[in-house]
Amino acid sequence: MNLSATLLLAFGMSMDAFAASIGKGATLHKPKFSEALRTGLIFGVIEAITPLVGWLLGLLATQFVLTWNHWIAFVLLVFLGGRMIIEGVRGCEEASEKIRRHSFWLLVTTAFATSLDAMAVGVGLAFLQVDIIKTALAIGCATLIMSTLGMMVGRFIGPLLGKRAEILGGVVLIGIGCQILWSHFAG
């Protein structure tokens, strides 16, 4: 795979994480760049690891991975999105505005859920002549950049939406999950 194809793949794989990061950034009270970078690093590392795992699974058990990856992503994203919507509704009822950070495990779970498509791509890459390490690093770096940018975009959207930002973030995650499921069934 040439450099331009690798970069297109890398940035294509980062789009779900970008959308999720916008939602995450919008739910925080003006996240600092360090928080955006932390989120970008978590998303980027996980997005770099999942195609490697997919590649290894592709060598071992292609059919199982392709049968279940969309369901796993859908369930995780709907669960996380539902949780955000519930917290957003509760937040609308509370008057206090507090500075928050997303927990490490919440970010890891979200990053994993949005990176399962990269795992499926890794399965496919097992059958091609690619340098999987360089490809995985490109995907991870693109995701780090896009997730960090997404958090900063969310920083500006969040104050406009107020406490409804968390509800919107949850809807975005559920939408990503539905899109993953739809793309599997649509073909």
Curated annotation (Swiss-Prot):
UniProtKB keywords: Cell inner membrane, Cell membrane, Ion transport, Manganese, Membrane, Transmembrane, Transmembrane helix, Transport
InterPro entries found in the cross-reference section: Mntp/YtaF (IPR003810), Put_MntP (IPR022929)
Membrane topology: Multi-pass membrane protein
Any Gene Ontology CC annotation: plasma membrane
Membrane-crossing segments per the record: 3-23, 41-61, 62-82, 106-128, 142-162, 167-187
Keyword Transport (UniProt): yes
Gene Ontology MF, one: manganese ion transmembrane transporter activity
Keyword Acetylation carried by entry: no
Subcellular location: Cell inner membrane
HAMAP family associated with the record: MntP_pump (MF_01521)
Free-text function comment from the UniProt entry: Probably functions as a manganese efflux pump.
Homology family: Belongs to the MntP (TC 9.B.29) family.
Name assigned to this protein: Putative manganese efflux pump MntP
Gene source species: Cronobacter sakazakii (strain ATCC BAA-894)
